[in-house]
């Protein structure tokens, strides 16, 4: 079976972290985010195509050096082609039912059940669906007996046909490729799905977790889900000392801790947290939080220092930065 992973965006919503790396390689629970996508592919997948447009050589080198037990080909887009164009780019290589995954999404969709649903309905295309409270930022569907009758992209909440949204996981038959015009940017959501709804487009609602990890809030939510899903732990090579660990945390080797850590905290290798507080945050490799500082709801880049008494909340701080003593960084992006 074949799979396409859509990782072609610039990662603007996670800047400045993506100034130095493609979004597919942004660490999530101390592993490149794209690996969490591969973890959840159907076991039958033995060939995958990763569509990228930003820093393609970095992605290509990563897969060349990483053995996933799957034949991976990186397909470079000279310019972003949208979700549909990226799928069409693999057209000459697709020969059977295939899976498409949005590279930003972290979820618990049951792919074996999803595939069984697709085949039972003899669907041309199937979309995994997730119910959300506010559907206005997503593609929303209307359904009858499992079949999608209407697909509306980002409707006002009061006009949404349901609260079931496109979860960014698809199963397609090769014939779907005929619905995508070649040589230009094409949106599956606004151009292809509405046409497929007339031909045989089915929706597979699922429970469990789902998050768009391409935003700060979504990234931290995804980390929380993964920590709860058997992702927490403390490496034996970490020096925890008298640090207080609250709730689910993941602490890598070489960390030296003496503050209050957690809940929902991920520390990359070699991090140091003095008598400080870190909550609902990720600190990447080599980051330091000095005495009296507070980090909440944030991502701290590699080799970055949060100085004594500083506060970082709801922010992204890039690699190699220094938050000076006593500074308050609130809802900012700091390079």
Model-derived regions, located:
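Catalytic-core segments of class I nucleotidyltransferases/pyrophosphorylases
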Residues: 98-99, 106, 112-119, 132-133, ...
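N-terminal glycine-rich phosphate-binding loop and ensuing alpha1 helix
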Residues: 1-60
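Short internal beta-strands
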Residues: 47-53, 128-129, 299, 316
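Glycine-rich hexapeptide-repeat left-handed beta-helix
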Residues: 92, 273-335
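Conserved beta-loop-beta/alpha segment of the NTase-like Rossmann-fold superfamily
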Residues: 43, 59-145, 181
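A structural signal for short hydrophobic beta-strand segments in well-ordered beta-sheet cores
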Residues: 25, 140-143, 193, 203
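Residues at the starts of beta-strands that form the adenosine-phosphate
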Residues: 2, 46-49, 71, 124-125, ...
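Extended, small-residue-rich solenoid/repeat segments and analogous flexible loops
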Residues: 197-286
């Amino acid at each position: 079976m074949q799979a396409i992973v859509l990782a072609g965006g610039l990662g603007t919503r996670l800047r400045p972290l993506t100034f130095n790396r493609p979004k597919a390689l942004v660490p999530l629970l101390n592993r490149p985010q794209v690996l969490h996508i591969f973890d959840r592919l159907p076991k039958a997948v033995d060939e995958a195509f990763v569509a990228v447009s930003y820093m393609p050589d970095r992605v290509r080198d990563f897969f060349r050096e990483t053995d996933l037990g799957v034949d991976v080909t990186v397909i470079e887009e000279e310019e972003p082609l949208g979700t549909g164009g990226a799928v069409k780019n693999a057209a000459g290589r697709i020969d059977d039912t295939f899976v498409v995954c949005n590279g930003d999404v972290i979820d618990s969709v049951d792919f074996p059940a999803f595939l069984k649903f697709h085949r039972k309905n003899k669907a041309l295309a199937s979309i995994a669906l997730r119910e959300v409270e506010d559907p206005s930022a997503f593609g929303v569907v209307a359904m009858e007996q499992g079949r999608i009758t209407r697909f509306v992209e980002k409707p006002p909440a009061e006009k949404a046909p349901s609260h079931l949204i496109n979860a960014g996981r698809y199963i397609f038959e090769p014939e779907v490729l005929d619905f995508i015009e070649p040589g230009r940017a094409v949106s599956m959501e606004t151009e292809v799905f509405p046409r497929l709804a007339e031909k045989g487009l089915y929706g597979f609602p699922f429970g469990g977790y789902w998050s768009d990890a391409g935003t700060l809030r979504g990234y931290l939510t995804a980390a929380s889900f993964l920590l709860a899903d058997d992702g927490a732990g403390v490496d034996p090579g970490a020096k925890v000392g008298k640090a207080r660990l609250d709730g689910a945390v993941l602490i890598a080797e070489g960390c030296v801790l003496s503050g209050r850590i957690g809940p929902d905290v991920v520390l990359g290798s070699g991090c140091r947290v003095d008598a400080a507080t870190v909550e609902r945050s990720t600190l990447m490799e080599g980051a330091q939080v000095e005495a009296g500082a507070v980090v909440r709801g944030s991502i701290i880049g590699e080799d970055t220092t949060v100085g004594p008494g500083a506060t970082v909340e709801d922010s992204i701080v890039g690699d190699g930065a220094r938050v000076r003593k006593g500074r308050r960084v609130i809802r900012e992006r700091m390079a």
